[in-house]
Amino acid sequence: MNNAINSPVIVALDNMTKNASLALADQLDPALCRLKVGKELYTRCGPEIVKALHQRQFEVFLDLKFHDIPNTTAQAVLAAAELGIWMVNVHASAGLEAMALAKQRLLDSDFDTLLIAVTVLTSMDNEALMQTGITDGLDAQVSRLAQLTKQAGLDGVVCSAQEAKTLKALCGQDFKLITPGIRLLDDNADDQKRICTPKQALNDGSDYLVIGRSITQAADPAAKLQLILQSL
């Protein structure tokens, strides 16, 4: 589809029903943004929600964060690609073998679906990491998993804007950085610990910006999207 190729904005359809998601999609221009379908919406609606968004000419980021043994992870990624999605993700902590196999399955089947990895969830901080047994800090863990992702041949990682400069230097300019936790200055932080404004994120090296409530809960989502794009 490639309609939104010049826009860095991915609108997150989080905490929404199928009807609400499609109503929002009908207010947005597929030339100005892509859409993210996460676990809740996909679990409620299945592949039909992706098909409905494709019918509206949107490119879709399927945000299911697959994390399983290598073959299961790879087959799940392949199944996602068969839906015609633009991008899908896995957890980097699934390991090098799982990530590399998933990428190879895409290549073997001639899919150009972008495959990215999640390093550390943006809701987590150093204390949360320590509770899981990772004691050398957030920055070290993010860098380690980003390098593992690059080694596996994936296209990029999900990361906070604060990590973008470091990861671009570490993994190269072609390594895509997808940044959630994007808020406007007058928004609440909600459940994200590491947040940033759209312009700051792009300046710091992010390639794509995942924006949810700022747009989805706006009185006029289309106008808010235009405002964000004009600010970049």
From Swiss-Prot:
Catalysed reactions listed for this entry: orotidine 5'-phosphate + H(+) = UMP + CO2
Biological processes per GO annotation: 'de novo' pyrimidine nucleobase biosynthetic process; 'de novo' UMP biosynthetic process
Pfam families documented for this protein: OMPdecase
Residues holding substrate: 14, 36, 63-72, 122, 183, 192, 212-213
Cellular-component GO terms for this entry: cytosol
PROSITE patterns: OMPDECASE (PS00156)
Keyword Lyase: yes
Keywords: Decarboxylase, Lyase, Pyrimidine biosynthesis
InterPro entries (alphabetical): Aldolase_TIM, OMPdecase, OMPdecase_AS, OMPdecase_bac, OMPdeCOase_dom, RibuloseP-bd_barrel
This enzyme's EC code(s): 4.1.1.23
Class of this enzyme: lyase
Gene Ontology MF: a single term: orotidine-5'-phosphate decarboxylase activity
Biochemical pathway: Pyrimidine metabolism; UMP biosynthesis via de novo pathway; UMP from orotate: step 2/2
Family to which the UniProt record says this protein belongs: Belongs to the OMP decarboxylase family. Type 1 subfamily.
Assembly and oligomerization: Homodimer.
Function: Catalyzes the decarboxylation of orotidine 5'-monophosphate (OMP) to uridine 5'-monophosphate (UMP).
NCBIfam families recorded: PRK00230.1, pyrF
Name the record gives this protein: Orotidine 5'-phosphate decarboxylase
